[in-house]
Regions:
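A cross-kingdom feature that marks ATP-driven nucleic-acid transaction machinery
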Residues: 1-86
Length: 86
């Protein structure tokens, strides 16, 4: 949870340093809009060094202008199992 009160769904830490490596937000919408990303953007203000991912039902992967990766859930899982993220 960010100091502002916003939160993200999943936080992945580096094993030994406890630095945040990934912040992941999960949305059930068909297309992620800016309003869906308030929490992850607030979290980024406190942890600017990590990767930001939003998983949703979007039709294809994309990246926002400010660097948040948006992945359709099925494509995210394929990439996850292939080792792309961790």
């Amino acid at each position: 949870r960010a100091a502002s009160g916003f939160e993200v769904d999943i936080i992945i830490f580096e094993p030994y340093s406890r630095e945040v490596k990934y912040a992941i937000e999960v949305k059930s919408c068909e297309e992620v809009q800016n309003r869906h990303l308030k929490g992850i953007r607030a979290f980024r203000e406190e942890h600017p060094q990590c990767h930001y991912i939003c998983i949703s039902h979007d039709k294809s992967p994309r990246m926002t202008d400010d660097g948040i990766e948006i992945w359709p859930v099925d494509e995210f899982l394929k990439q996850l199992w292939s080792g792309r993220f961790f």
